[in-house]
Amino acid sequence: MKCKNTIAMVLAGAMLLPSNAFAADLSQYKDFPNDWSAKSLEQAIDDGLLNGSNGMIDAKGLLTRAQMAAIVSRAFGAAKTASLDDYRDVLPSAWYYSDMGKAVKMGAFQGANGLLNPDAPITREEAFTVLARAFALEGGGSATLKDFVDGGTVSSWASESVAALVAGGYVNGANGMLNLKNNITRAEFAKVITGMAASYVGAEGVSGKTVEGNVIVRESGASLSGMTINGDLIIADSADKVSLDNVKVTGRIVIRGASTEASLKNSSAGKSVLVSNPNGAASLSVSGGSVGTVTAKSDLVVSGSVDNIVIAEKAALTVQSGASVGSVTVSAAGASVSGAGTVSAVQANANNVTVSTKNTKVTAASGVSGVKAGDKTVDSGKTGTVGTAPSSGGSSSGGSSSSRSDYSYVLMNIPYDEFYKAEL
């Protein structure tokens, strides 16, 4: 079988292949099917996601929660583990102990009432929810499920995730049914996850390729250059350093790594760049190209030049010295914008937003409180500038009848209050 899903890099005339570049010997599985699932199962085995046992692949067997945790952690190259002390049903001696810890650390798995239920079969809606979390999928809405006979049976906690997979074309159902309450088989899950991850990139990187579908970079040090990805590019949990040079991504660039340093040179994202990890701050450097809007759902350090950033969850945005950001929109309470770089404007649509980047114009939306421009409070519906007095009427220069320059104290490096006290 030709390996269609492995990307290689041509360097100095040598072909460097990832570890999963060679097709698995399927003859070792005496129960390997010859039906609709064969291609997906073969790909899942080649990609290092699915393993058999005792000469059996057990395609029709039900996937357990522990097995799914193992597959997802392999797909994303997860290495860090969360403490499982709060879960009384996962013993350190169990084969899946490490995988369950990785899946929890990723934010893909969540338990309830002190239980992770590792040995229980996983339902289709549970599996779709885990995948939506891992791939950082959003959108679709409940209306997306109305075309399915059983779309209304989806659990409230799974609705958005299931809709996202349907909207993305990853789940189609059968005979007008999604069968959300049914347990998912190993073959069914292989079909879904191989449709969501077409290719993987290791530390050896890739050059000069066009890839159809989503690509996951799951090892640190990867360099991608001169290529087109017709889908999403996901920089996974253990990919600490990744560089892109002249790479066109028609979908999203998703940064999942907790300490990822992503360098984008003359590269583009057709939809957006999403920074989403539960475990630390990622760094993003942009030089040339067009990445559209960068959405931060976790702490982010920016260098280079970025037009627009949206802080969608409570997070800290740090703009490095020499870096520039056109505008920042904050929709999460308690978020902050700081650093020695420049930010032209911040729109604060949530409470308790703090901005300390010099000369940044900060606008507090109507009904919002606790917004700070430097050490000054910006009242609801008004605008202030870091280093100057807050103003009324939405302008950083309006609202004052004094002929004194609001910028004099900045140039003299004297605190605002002390400057005007001295004048009086």
Positions of predicted regions on the chain:
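Low-complexity, acidic Ser/Thr/Pro-rich repeat tracts that form intrinsically disordered stalk/linker regions
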Residues: 22-47, 56-58, 91, 387-424
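Extended beta-solenoid/beta-helix repeat architectures
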Residues: 198-394
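Short, structured beta-strand segments at or near domain termini in extracellular proteins/domains
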Residues: 189-190
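Intrinsic-disorder/low-complexity regions
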Residues: 4, 19, 24, 46, ...
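Feature responds to low-complexity, polar/acidic, surface-exposed segments characteristic
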Residues: 2-38, 46-98, 105-126, 132-159, ...
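A generic tandem-repeat structural signature
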Residues: 100-105, 109-116, 120-125, 129, ...
